Amino acid sequence: MKHLTVREIVLCGLFIALITTGTFIRIPVGTDVYTLQFLFTLLAGLVLGARLGAVAVAAYVLLGLLGVPVFASGGGPAYVLQPTFGYLLAFILQAWFGGYYVRRGAAVSYGRLLLANLGGMVIVYLIGIAWFYLVSNYVIAAPIPLWTAILYCGILQAPPDFLLCLAAAGIGLRCYRSGVWIVEEKHTALHKEVCA
């Protein structure tokens, strides 16, 4: 595995801090409370790329499992038994997918960044809802119907998460044009061309 440069380590550390901070920024919407955690996992993939984005999010998850209170309800290895832990695992794959998608094929654009985010959102929902359903029904003995899990963990969460996808695409494009972006070697020429 390729060694990380100082810049890459700093950016990974920055995103670990941003994801942690976003977890505790609570925005009340009606009877629900939303955080900015998803926004920063989206940006981790877009800005850092597939490999580093996944590394940054995985490091955040590992810190929480080691007991550092970076999750919404604390931390520690027992957190894997939380119904919502599947979302944390899914964020790793989501960051990888976002970074991979925007660095393959066509030039980077707002639309391409948004598609990467929406694809990542689907990944998070599929894994997160499945984990929530399985843990609720077979681990903590708090059974819920699958439809209820889909409704409360997916359908009702989709509008605010879609807004975060829109915001992350805009911020990601600004980062791309300003050079705050990890560019794979074979895409450097394309990056310079778009930013020119």
Where are these regions (language model features)?
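Residue-level recognition of membrane-helix boundary sites in multi-pass small-molecule transporters
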Residues: F40, R51-L52, F85, R112, ...
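Alpha-helical membrane-inserting segments
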Residues: L18, G22, R26, A44, ...
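Interfacial aromatic-anchored transmembrane helix boundaries in multi-pass membrane proteins
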Residues: G22-Y34, A59-Q94
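Lipid-exposed faces of alpha-helical membrane segments in multi-pass integral membrane proteins
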Residues: V10, L14, L18, F40, ...
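Short, charged juxtamembrane terminal tails flanking transmembrane helices
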Residues: M1-V6, Y176, V180-A196
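Membrane-embedded alpha-helical hairpins and interfacial helices in multi-pass inner-membrane proteins
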Residues: S109-T188
